[in-house]
Amino acid sequence: MNQYTKRFLTSTALFLSLAATCSTAATAQDAINVYGPGGPAPAIQEAAKAFGAANQMTVNVAAGPTNQWIDKAKQDADIVFSGAENMMTDFAKALPGAFDLADAQPMYLRPVAILVRPGNPKKIRGFRDLLVPSVKVLTVAGAGQTGLWEDVAGRTGDIAIVRAFRKNMVFPEAANSGAAKQHWTEQKDIDAWLIWNIWQVANPELAQVVPMDEPFRIYRDTGVVLTYKGSAQPKAKAFVDFLQSPAGQKIFGKWGWDTR
C-alpha cells in the first residue's frame, strides 16, 4: 500500500468518524427527554408521539415511580411533569439545581373517583357507601395522592366520617398508584379503590368508575416545568406549549382530564 493510499484511507476514516460524531450530536439535539409519574403518562406519551411526528423529532418519555427514572433525569431531563403540586415540590428536592420550582405551570385538573369491581357488586353509588362496615377500600399514601383520603373524608368537618372510612381502609396503604394497581389486581377481596378518575380511563378492564359525589370531590393538577437544560432548547419549549394548546387539550381530555 503506497503512501497516497494510506493518507486517503486515513483521511476517509477521520471524515467518517467526524460525520458519525456530528450525526450523533444532531440526533441528541433533535430529541428531548421528559420525565414524570405514571398517572399523567398516557396523555403525555400520546402528546409526545403527535408532537414528535409533526416536528420530525423524538420526544422520549420516561414515566412511573420516581426511583425508576430519577438518576437518568439528573443527567438529561429537559422537562419534568407531575401528578400533583406536592409531587413537583418533591421533584425539585430530588433534582436539586435542575429547575426553578417557581417556573412550574399547572396544566389540567382531574377529580378523585371511586373505582369498583366490574359490575359493581357492592352497589356503591357514592362516598358514604364506603363507610359501610363490610366494605374494604384501597388507598394510596404517597406520590400524587399524599393525604388524599384524609382530604376527601374530612371535607365536611365531621370526624366520625374520617373514623368510619379509616376503619375500612386496607393496610398498609399502597406507596403509589402503580403499587395500588397491583394490589387491586391481586387482592380480589378489595371492594373499592379511592384514586383519580384517570386510572380507570387508562385501565377500563380492571374497574368501573363511580364519580365522586359532592361535597367529597376534590381535584389535583398535573404540572410541567422546563429544566435549565430544556430552557435552552426551543423544541422543549415548543412541546410544553403544545401540551397546553387545543391539540394538547384534546389529548388530555381523551384521557379523563378536565380541560376547561
Predicted regions and their residues:
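Exported/periplasmic ABC-transporter solute-binding proteins
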Residues: T27-A62, N67-A77, A84-E85, F91-K93, ...
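Bacterial N-terminal signal peptides
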Residues: S11-T21
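Bacterial N-terminal signal peptides that target proteins for export
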Residues: N2-T12
